[in-house]
Amino acid sequence: CCMKSDKKAVWGWALYDWANSAFATTVMAGFFPIFFKQYWSHGADVNVSTAQLGFGNSIASFIVALMAPVLGAMADKGSAKKKFLVFFAYLGVLMTAALFLVQKGQWGWAIFIYAMGIIGFSGANVFYDSLLPAIADEEKIDYVSGLGFSVGYLGGGLLFLVNVLMT
């Protein structure tokens, strides 16, 4: 086979996307906006809560846009890709778990913690993506990338379904 590494490395890389996409589908696209509007922004006018959510997403996106070139350069030149991947992934996981502690009406804390979760998620993605050339030869890189993408959609979709069934 043309893999630089064994199948275990390829599947390990792909299965990271399984968990990673679960954050995107369940937290970012699915439930955070609903919980934000109905719980953390309790009592706020719908236009105000929409503006607050938009502001939070914009600030997080702006910070990610500022960080991405620096993190990308670190990923391209550095040898600590896995350490940075783990750091940012843990940041995302811890911030997502911390949302449990945010009380009703505390929209500011919810936005701050959510934004930190997005920074963790996005920062981890930079280093996750940078690992692909290390596990796949150039002629197999599309296949391995597609494997991660498809496994990610499957994982994200399954968790989203489980979460919907829980509500």
Task: Indicate residue ranges for each PLM-predicted region.
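Glycine-rich segments within core transmembrane alpha-helices of 12-TM secondary carriers
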Residues: 143-167
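C-terminal ends and interior cores of transmembrane alpha-helices
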Residues: 65, 86-106
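Cytoplasmic helix-loop-helix junction between adjacent transmembrane helices
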Residues: 113, 119-150
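Short hydrophobic/alpha-helical segments at membrane-entry points of transmembrane helices
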Residues: 106-114
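Helix-to-coil boundary motifs at intracellular loop junctions of multi-pass secondary transporters
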Residues: 39, 77-78, 131-136
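Central cavity-lining transmembrane alpha-helices of secondary-active solute carriers
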Residues: 53-73, 157-160
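Helix-loop boundary and gating motifs at the non-cytosolic
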Residues: 4-61, 108
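Cytoplasmic membrane-interface "Motif A"-like loop-to-helix N-cap segments
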Residues: 75-91
